[in-house]
């Protein structure tokens, strides 16, 4: 317990400084009142605790500027977040108690004061508490919330082995509709990240691609014994997801990792068979989720090449507004329709816009901003990425923000009879194989 004594203030302080001013001054110079009222040890302790706090704040700020990936990796890790939160919590508790003690000393009363004096004391105490304990308490909540969100985004699955020093992640854009049950996949992209440098390649594939080779161990080979997912127009790459969700859950029973689903696993089998590279994880986000993320990040700047509708159908019925050509900072809803609009544009055009939007999001957002909005991101997406991928993904975000990323798009290929060998060769060349 901190010592609380009935103390007389020095005459000059009693005459010239009201209690609230003394309490405020003690926030700037912790322990001042205690030292001036004979409690030198407590006052000195308060001063050095404050110095330690400011040093930690300065070191954290410098770390975020000079080595953001390392700092955020520690702050969001299962081991680091509790330690940081505990430290901040102890600071908050210390400042809370010190604020009460300072207010009591400033009022020159003892713990046995009358009720009327307590009422007068409350206002000073509240001011001290708000000024002193609220920031570290809020920081504690922020760290715990960010870690909780990161835990919701990442899974506890084992970190996968790299493939040629890379991790490959399927980024899937969902398109739910009130007139249609379930969700279909509207955009399919594979992000390939070098685990050492963070250098990234974005591979964009058309959802309507047909004649997809399957992996050797795919459960779908029990249906397509030739090893090729092929039944004409009804067997498109993007259809693997809804088919898996609605019809093939039993085929994938026992093979679905945490955070994934039968639809994601079916699409993973198609991507791995087509590209001949392993897909180590997936992220699924629908258009409302995309809009929420873009809004949380303050919008995204893109170069709009043609006038695009917001809402409406192919006949411009129900259009709520327009996205005009030129460089625009798009809101969440505008960004979703920039990627989604089908009016007067081809599938290749849509793929290009989706790739542009994703690229701009990745290049305009730094790791610190991503960490601040982990809650929104975790609520908007579904992911099966293991926690062990976090440091590499933060490094990739930092690298992309500084140097951009490479892009490979297959928007203009033959959808019905794709040249699979040519697709694989292009991917291999882009990856430097």
Short names for language-model regions:
Residues 1-5, 28, 32, 59, ...:
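N-terminal secretory targeting signals
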Residues 110-142:
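Internal/C-terminal transmembrane anchor helices
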Residues 1-16:
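Actinobacteria-biased recognition of intrinsically disordered, low-complexity terminal regions
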Residues 15-54:
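Hydrophobic, aromatic-rich membrane-embedded alpha-helical segments
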Residues 136-433:
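Non-catalytic, solvent-exposed segments at the cell envelope interface
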Residues 33-42, 95-117:
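Cytoplasmic membrane-interface segments at the C-terminal ends of transmembrane helices
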Residues 52-106:
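Membrane-embedded alpha-helical segments of integral membrane proteins
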Residues 39-42, 46, 73-87, 112-115:
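Membrane-interface helix-boundary signature
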